[in-house]
Amino acid sequence: MSESAGKTRRAAEVAANVAGATERRRVQSIREPLSPGAYVEYSVDDQPGVVERARAYLAGAPCEPVAPRRAATVMLVSEGKPHYRRFESPLAGGAPIEETVDAAPVDVFMLRRASTMAFTPDAVVFPGGGMDARDVECAVPWAGPSPEQWARLMSCTEPEARGIITAAAREVFEESGVLLASAPGGAAPIDERGAHWACEREAVATRQISFGEFLRERGLVLRSDLMRLRSHWVTPESEARRYDTYFFLARLPEGQHADGRTSEAVEAAWIAPGEALMRFDAGLLKLVPPTISNLTSIVAATSVDEAWNTPFDGHVRPHPVARACGEVVLGCEVSET
């Protein structure tokens, strides 16, 4: 797209955003459950760089949007684990936050990213990361819904679906030690705490072997039926670092234990979705908008089964929006495909 065409398109976006503000359906926030057809807007005032780039984008500054990198993130959930629920907050001077005594019906496993990370440093996130070329190219032993079935659900190609599902399972293994796999036919629970598992986990994380090679050597199959699609978020075109991220929900498999032994995080904990949101509101945890939205989607769940059965939020592809008052936010209509 030429520079002049880009400016024209963005000028039209600004005009439509402002002129159509009163004509839109109700504007939702990311603190409300999303669904296809909803219109959502959210502030990014806590991220001055994002606001600055969004203003420049709407003003028609020269910008060739970068292609977003495919990524996968997994909300690993379990019944409440009060004895594991602890985070130290860098926003509260590093002091441990008081544990909750009463167990919540659902906890989610989260990691606090290292302050040295280029992307979302110090943020509390779910396990996940970018899709690797070998996630697509390497044959992965498979059980559960096929890549073709996932592709229809995810609105992507079959190779992309295979790669994204593989990346989701691989990232969970690398960052939490949990293996969304089993012997063919779903045999006895896997105990992943042995030294040999730690060595192979490190080998996968450092790309010495692919996740598919690891599964084949162990006689295991990836269990795509252990994952449920939650939402799909794409970073706005105004950003230089963009991700095309599918969020999944997975139950903690019987007999397995999540940890945070990854170089990308400084701590890990099980925490109730509502508790994470309350700590964010209190300025004790840093959460980014997609994380806030996905936590909100299961905050009312009274059981792991209820969280599992929560409907798909939809595809969220936000773009800069200039409100009539002059505030710049991000927003979009949530789509079904």
Show the residue positions of the predicted features:
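N-terminal leader/linker segments that precede catalytic domains of diphosphate-processing enzymes
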Residues: S2-T337
